[in-house]
Amino acid sequence: MMKELPVDRDDAPEPVIQVGLPLTSDALNTLVAAAWPGHSERDWTPILSRSLLWVSAKQQERLVGFVNVAWDGDRHAFLLDTTVHPGVQRRGVGTRLVRAAAVATRAHGVEWVHMDYEPHLEAFYRGCGFAPTRAGLLRLAAPG
C-alpha cells in the first residue's frame, strides 16, 4: 500500500546514504510515487536481485532517495531509477547517491557508467561528473 511521505523540513537531519541496504517494494513504490506522478506499483524484488548494487538515502528511517546500478557483467554499468523525494530535492541528495554509486561500482572493476540523458537535467548530470554523448536507442515495447 502506497502512502505519501511528508515533505521534509529544513531542520530535518541530513539523509544517510548507504550501499546495498535491504529495501522493500512498498518503500520503493512509495518513494517513486512521490517523485514520479503516474507511477504504477511494481515488485522490485526481481529487479534488485539482478542489480550489481543499489544506493539508498534514508532520513529518519524513511526512504528519500534511490539509484539502481545494472551492469553487463564486465566493464559497463548503467544507472537506473535515480529518484529523490521532492521534499529533499535540490539539496545534493541525488548527487550524493550517484557519487556513492560510482565509488561502489568502481570497486567491482567497472570502467564506464552510463545514464539516460534528459536535457533538463544537464546541470545535475554534469555535477555528478557525466558528459553527454550520442547513443542509439531501439524501443522494443509498444508505447502506452
Language-model features: where?
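Conserved acetyl-CoA pyrophosphate-binding loop and the N-cap/start of the following alpha-helix
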Residues: 88, 92-100
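Conserved acetyl-CoA-binding loop of GNAT-fold acetyltransferases
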Residues: 126-136
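Conserved beta-strand-loop-alpha-helix junction that forms the acyl-donor binding cleft
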Residues: 114-123, 138-143
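Conserved GNAT acetyl-CoA-binding A-motif
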Residues: 105-117
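Short amphipathic alpha-helix that is part of the acyltransferase structural core
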Residues: 2-43, 56, 136
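A conserved beta-strand-loop-helix scaffold within acyl/acetyltransferase catalytic domains
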Residues: 42-83
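Short acidic/polar active-site loop segments enriched in Thr and Asp
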Residues: 75, 111, 131
